């Protein structure tokens, strides 16, 4: 039986027994070796590169591997089969598609600004930021031969007196450790739980000094998971962190994940990837950072798209992508942390923001709540740019929503040098029209070199190439120069960082295929907006606000986004970047009982438009797949300098 050794950059080698003919990418997945494969192994993205160090692989040529690179040993793992013992080098993808766990510096005002803004917005709408979770310290007389009251009755009496309730519930998971905790603390303890009318439901009995009651709000993105811990009494953010979604190795988009979970054992693999590999380690890390215990987490909330919600709870997601596109659930009540084996209080409710449709999920419901458009007279667009594109239009009188198949281009997928907005990502760019020389802004320290390009950088680069007349309306190169190179097929590319200027020693560039992929992604966004407006018989001029959310990069240049025809050509002052609205909405849900109820109300009142069956959408999409559009009258401010 052959052995394959994966030499992981920056990590320990992993040795795997396998069979002749095994696919190398599938073998890496079984061994829990992270290889970047946004297309889930269909050969289209070219990102699952590995280097053959020793032995042989059966692999076929690819347009993504040059002859020189092939001679050096570079292969695509998705198109390589095992023929015998071999050793392969696996590049570190942590800085690109998967990010290592990061804990935010809460001393930075930027890290907590979106939560303060969300709380202020909801309070103005009459939402009270209160909940019914409580921590109370009680002291009881210790039992004796003269006082034979059992522990549960002793605690019940103490809580009834302290809280003024008529009934106390002590669930099994609390009861089984009650005797030990009471005696360990000489019957002086802190009790945490939830007030339910005249009843107090105990959730935790612990040492008297442990009075923290904590909420956990989570945004589960297709690419990235972000989480905050908050004090359920004050609303203060205790810790914030993020990590790459462990499911990324099964594909960058939800369709590939759905296909993968439909394979034998796939649902369990995808659920483990999000729970065991992603959520649970972040929770443990943030609790340690905040100095609180995991059982102190008394309520959790989740903002996630419909597919992520299904994969989280382990429900088959096949119906999400199958006609008539009806998911297994929109709203899920009664879910507890113990049901998912999450390291929180086992009785902690897990509130999942309701889904609207197959491709408009709870992340959009939570984001709509946070944006405040549901309580505004102004007609507003809410656009979430992540691995997919979701759009909501309306005001307090109506809300209509849709999702478009933008693909993962906004987070670096489908782009040869694309990556998330992490260290080394080019996030902004200008180009000199005469010299064609770029000036870039790179995420990271001052001496950070370029690794790739994130979504906001891609928008800038394409807009600048079009403005300078370097590419035409189809995204094809029409000027030559040192920065414009062509391969042996004649395909052009623009080099932003030469080999000696990059972090990896490989050039960072954008080619005609990348530009075409992004044009289709931006075309999907614009045509979805146009279709939503058409569905309610509203002109572009009716738009009073445009709220942009998502992981595309906080430095998104709205002018450039309009210039390439991604957003409608409205006054720039109408645009507002609101950050991770799914997370801020989830924060509101976990902190406020009224906000949680309002989220369900917003979902119930929102109309979902299925674009795949909507008349005229495809014609609108095709027309939008140019820079900026086939009808340039729609973009009077789009600039292409002569």
Regions found by a protein language model. Name each.
Residues 218-222, 227-255, 319-332, 366, ...:
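Glycine-rich phosphate-binding loop of actin/hexokinase-like ATP-binding domains
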Residues 466-536:
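A contiguous, well-structured pocket-lining segment that forms one wall/lid of small-molecule binding clefts
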Residues 246-289, 414, 425-430, 517, ...:
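N-terminal phosphate-binding loop and adjacent alpha-helix
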Residues 304-319, 490, 538, 550-569, ...:
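Short glycine/threonine-rich loop-to-helix capping motif typified by GTGT followed
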Residues 69-71, 76-217, 222, 234, ...:
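Nucleotide/phosphate-binding catalytic cleft detector across ATP-hydrolyzing
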Residues 395-397, 404, 538-602:
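Catalytic phosphate/nucleotide-handling subdomain of diverse soluble enzymes
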Residues 342-343, 354-370, 519-523, 575-610:
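Glycine-rich phosphate-binding/hydrolytic loop that grips phosphoryl groups
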Residues 27-31, 36, 47-97:
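Iron-sulfur (Fe-S) cluster-binding segments and ferredoxin-like electron-carrier domains
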